[in-house]
Amino acid sequence: RMPSGPGHYGASAETPGPRPPLCPASSCCLPTEAMGPRALLVLLMATAWHAQGVPVIQPSGPELVVEPGTTVTLRCVGNGSVEWDGPISPHWNLDLDPPSSILTTNNATFQNTGTYHCTEPGNPRGGNATIHLYVKDPARPWKVLAQEVTVLEGQDALLPCLLTDPALEAGVSLVRVRGRPVLRQTNYSFSPWHGFTIHKAKFIENHVYQCSARVDGRTVTSMGIWLKVQKDISGPATLTLEPAELVRIQGEAAQIVCSASNIDVNFDVSLRHGDTKLTISQQSDFHDNRYQKVLTLNLDHVSFQDAGNYSCTATNAWGNHSASMVFRVVESAYSNLTSEQSLLQEVTVGEKVDLQVKVEAYPGLESFNWTYLGPFSDYQDKLDFVTIKDTYRYTSTLSLPRLKRSESGRYSFLARNAGGQNALTFELTLRYPPEVRVTMTLINGSDTLLCEASGYPQPSVTWVQCRSHTDRCDESAGLVLEDSHSEVLSQVPFYEVIVHSLLAIGTLEHNRTYECRAFNSVGNSSQTFWPISIGAHTPLPDELLFTPVLLTCMSIMALLLLLLLLLLYKYKQKPKYQVRWKIIESYEGNSYTFIDPTQLPYNEKWEFPRNNLQFGKTLGTGAFGKVVEATAFGLGKEDAVLKVAVKMLKSTAHADEKEALMSELKIMSHLGQHENIVNLLGACTHGGPVLVITEYCCYGDLLNFLRRQAEAMLGPSLSVGQDPEAGAGYKNIHLEKKYVRRDSGFSSQGVDTYVEMRPVSTSSSNDSFSEEDLGKEDGRPLELRDLLHFSSQVAQGMAFLASKNCIHRDVAARNVLLTSGRVAKIGDFGLARDIMNDSNYIVKGNARLPVKWMAPESIFDCVYTVQSDVWSYGILLWEIFSLGLNPYPGILVNSKFYKLVKDGYQMAQPAFAPKNIYSIMQACWALEPTRRPTFQQICSLLQKQAQEDRRVPNYTNLPSSSSSRLLRPWQRTPPVAR
């Protein structure tokens, strides 16, 4: 039966389904003395239903809602006696009138809220009737049935807070005490009849919870309900015995600790020495919701009687859990060195061997090392070994990879502790195939061939004679000579065994070849000897006599070789397509280790069918490939039609250039998406050339966009010279056009008047543009806020790259694209750039580099870091606020330029740059990389400048006359070289 007040509560019940419409209190809660014809009709209907054998509750309906203070009567009618179950006492009066039972309360309160069941115990058919009563009290929206709930971990936990008003259900929530939210992983549901159910409660969800509801715009919480989630006690107590092994010298102190813990306090723990149970005082504690019992044996002066087996046992209702250890008592310190390998090792040259020593010592080793003892004094390499310690045992392994002859010899492991020093020595002998050398000598006036064979193991020697001069005697045609004499000349440990074999042949005959063959278990070798004339006692000639034909052939071959080397040099000098972006793997100071992009994974989710691409015009072309506008059908969504840009290589691309494009694809997929990066949309890597599908940027690159705007605002005579073909495409080529300029940016015919700037209205701009809006947006005059937005967006994109440990290495306006809404996106468009004819890329060594955008450490030391990208970003800022001028105007890239950069020269403030923006440029150009700001700091500075810009009128530059000059809304300062 349901309790009538706070108390202990158990696990949850099933929550009911959707409730039917509520029974109005006015029609169901009439006092018994006021029953009229309508009430009698209800009784007749109940009697008809009662005839079917199921108890009936009046009023009918699953729920009843009443106001506080109302008189409520609940009648249950059955075939025989019936019983009520629910929160009855002491809030109800019970009136038994078989076959019915009546519950009445004359002053309903929120305590009457609950579910009432009526059953008929004597009815064999069983059955019951249920009604849920709400007494809606705005001051008490919750009725808590229990203030403590205990469940086992993994069970559902019901927190029994009943809602007194069903109209409040939409605004209920579960919180922890003092309004703290529940844990993110807590999974719970709510039933107004039963309360909140936490599903599969976890041990970490032990908390005091409150039920919360919104009542008249304020939050009202219930009293706290303490949820206790207990670990399931499914076995014996956990047990530890420390140490697992113990060694002591006689007279030293020792300690053995036996510890057991469990959720339930009802368990025992004991410690035994052999069969003897030790009497030790027990320490108890409660930690991390577990009871812990500890037995500690302290021995101040150990003796041999204390040695032996110790066992710790924990016992509870689930059984026993035991652990044991061995305690050894020794007379003095010791160290024992052993090896499971033979101390005499033979290994073939070029192979690897591991020498391993096992040490058991007490006290622990003070020092240990491997030493090479010779005999080859020239072998002084540092030995590479690993030593693993386990209590009183050590395992030391010496690794010798790719053995050379000079590495044979004695290797000794030396270990020292308080007991003294011990050593274990291996003798390593290397096997290698024989080497043969044949010479001619005279012995007792007779021609004799001497064959010297050296190797290990000892080589065997045989002689073979064959007709004619040949490099090797055929086995079938040769004659094996048996009349040879062999003897061991030298046999020293760790050195080769040298064998001499003499072949007495009398007088040498012309047109004969003699071959000495030597072999052992590792391999074989041979050398031939033939005379060039009768009686000539010379060894085999090194080469044949030169002839004019041979000299001619060798001259031609040498000439061809030189030509081949020249072509190879020219090929190496030719620039190749490379990915400028680098991803840092690790760094130490200015020493960076970069990830090999070829080793990055490629996710097949980026794969896109190539027949779903419809190509359009070429956006940009270069020495290595091109970027083409295309329409992608089904990219992202099945029915989507999207304009994209597709990168591809030329058909003549080399394998390394194809690999570079694939690396670029992998880097883009590795970096992920960002609003200010030209994002990867897909790729085609199968069934044809590699295609990289990226976002299409309708305004092309930022450099040409700025130059178009400058010409529109200032006129051709005042603006930057520009490629006449430059439109809204990816025009990253032919940027070497000459244009009239000064240090400040733009030059006219020497007139000193300025173009007046006037405020323009500010209106909200839509971020999405249709095709017909692009021309109108492109024609909108530039404002200061546009330049600030470009700067901020590029900085945000670079901050994103820096957060991904990515270095761009070519930050410039030509590598920034503009899309709808004038959003700037960073990319790398070296594929579609002819760097051979691009004056921005200067030959330095065997590479072409954008030196005017490069930091000093990149120019002089080839060091590329995030800080060097910050320097390049400062140059890009100068490009933006000069409306597309080339950096360092009027300065050629030569030794003078390099000296200026090294000495800290800084360009003057560009014409359209506020003082704060120029200060950012100067900070980016600090000679010391660590003094340059980070991209996050640059973003903050630009946002602050943008906020200041919103507080002053915006200006647009307008040409007033052909004799006008530029005017800015901030103070003009003369160029300063720093």
From Swiss-Prot:
A single Gene Ontology molecular function, please? macrophage colony-stimulating factor receptor activity
**Family from the record:** Belongs to the protein kinase superfamily. Tyr protein kinase family. CSF-1/PDGF receptor subfamily.
Q: Where is this region: Disordered?
A: 952-978
In which residue ranges is the amino acid composition biased (Low complexity)? 958-969
Question: What protein is this chain from?
Answer: Tyrosine-protein kinase transforming protein fms
Q: Which gene encodes it?
A: V-FMS
Q: Give every Protein kinase domain span.
A: 613-942
Where located? Membrane
Top-level lineage group: Viruses
List ligand-binding residues for ATP.
L619, G620, T621, G622, A623, F624, G625, K626, V627, K647
Q: Which residues form the active site?
A: D810
* Enzyme Commission number, as recorded: 2.7.10.1
For this protein, the record's Gene3D superfamilies field holds: Immunoglobulins, Phosphorylase Kinase, domain 1, Transferase(Phosphotransferase) domain 1
Its placement in the membrane is given as:
Single-pass type I membrane protein
Matching PANTHER family: MACROPHAGE COLONY-STIMULATING FACTOR 1 RECEPTOR, TYROSINE-PROTEIN KINASE RECEPTOR
Q: What is its main location?
A: membrane
Outline which residue ranges sit on the Cytoplasmic face. 569-978
- Transmembrane spans: 544-568
Keyword hit for Repeat:
yes
Keywords carried by this UniProt record: ATP-binding, Disulfide bond, Glycoprotein, Immunoglobulin domain, Kinase, Membrane, Nucleotide-binding, Oncogene, Phosphoprotein, Receptor, Repeat, Transferase, Transmembrane, Transmembrane helix, Tyrosine-protein kinase
Q: Where is the signal peptide?
A: none
List of residues that carry Phosphotyrosine: Y841
The chain residues annotated with the modification Phosphothreonine are: T973
Please state what class of enzyme this protein is: transferase
